[in-house]
């Protein structure tokens, strides 16, 4: 079963990008490569249950098992030693990536309080977009009563776009609600 967002990309977005940026080949048109969800759990140093809860919440949001991230260096000020588990991340590709982006655009972002669109300044210079979510409760899979602590997460949308302008055009054509 083909995702509606993937179908929209193939039938509407890609031809529009080709005509706007004068590409000579279909393969030159920017496309989504992957979406990475990252949840840093700094208080996992003192209580490992917090990390387990973050992993299970990320599993519900993403629909696949996250990997636990570990500290690369020891930092005495944070009581952190190399190799300690301090967060989790998950990489979505293919159908799951399009399903997640569809859910993010149409369900989760409209549930953010005082939402006026996402910032257009969060591109990295190479067409990739980073979005910070302050609370995981905006996702419909998370039950409000089961959450003991509000956590945020980072969402990185990696595209094959060469410039920020191409990346912005790709995401806005896919329906990402950017602030005016």
Swiss-Prot record:
<dbReference type="GO" id="GO:0003735">
    <property type="term" value="F:structural constituent of ribosome"/>
</dbReference>
<dbReference type="InterPro" id="IPR022803">
    <property type="entry name" value="Ribosomal_uL5_dom_sf"/>
</dbReference>
<keyword id="KW-0820">tRNA-binding</keyword>
<comment type="similarity">
    <text>Belongs to the universal ribosomal protein uL5 family.</text>
</comment>
<dbReference type="InterPro" id="IPR020929">
    <property type="entry name" value="Ribosomal_uL5_CS"/>
</dbReference>
<keyword id="KW-0699">rRNA-binding</keyword>
<keyword id="KW-0687">Ribonucleoprotein</keyword>
<dbReference type="GO" id="GO:0000049">
    <property type="term" value="F:tRNA binding"/>
</dbReference>
<comment type="function">
    <text>This is one of the proteins that bind and probably mediate the attachment of the 5S RNA into the large ribosomal subunit, where it forms part of the central protuberance. In the 70S ribosome it contacts protein S13 of the 30S subunit (bridge B1b), connecting the 2 subunits; this bridge is implicated in subunit movement. Contacts the P site tRNA; the 5S rRNA and some of its associated proteins might help stabilize positioning of ribosome-bound tRNAs.</text>
</comment>
<dbReference type="InterPro" id="IPR031310">
    <property type="entry name" value="Ribosomal_uL5_N"/>
</dbReference>
<dbReference type="GO" id="GO:0006412">
    <property type="term" value="P:translation"/>
</dbReference>
<dbReference type="InterPro" id="IPR020930">
    <property type="entry name" value="Ribosomal_uL5_bac-type"/>
</dbReference>
<protein>
    <recommendedName>
        <fullName>Large ribosomal subunit protein uL5</fullName>
    </recommendedName>
</protein>
<dbReference type="GO" id="GO:1990904">
    <property type="term" value="C:ribonucleoprotein complex"/>
</dbReference>
<keyword id="KW-0689">Ribosomal protein</keyword>
<dbReference type="GO" id="GO:0019843">
    <property type="term" value="F:rRNA binding"/>
</dbReference>
<dbReference type="Pfam" id="PF00281">
    <property type="entry name" value="Ribosomal_L5"/>
</dbReference>
<dbReference type="InterPro" id="IPR031309">
    <property type="entry name" value="Ribosomal_uL5_C"/>
</dbReference>
<dbReference type="Pfam" id="PF00673">
    <property type="entry name" value="Ribosomal_L5_C"/>
</dbReference>
<dbReference type="GO" id="GO:0005840">
    <property type="term" value="C:ribosome"/>
</dbReference>
<keyword id="KW-0694">RNA-binding</keyword>
<comment type="subunit">
    <text>Part of the 50S ribosomal subunit; part of the 5S rRNA/L5/L18/L25 subcomplex. Contacts the 5S rRNA and the P site tRNA. Forms a bridge to the 30S subunit in the 70S ribosome.</text>
</comment>
<dbReference type="InterPro" id="IPR002132">
    <property type="entry name" value="Ribosomal_uL5"/>
</dbReference>
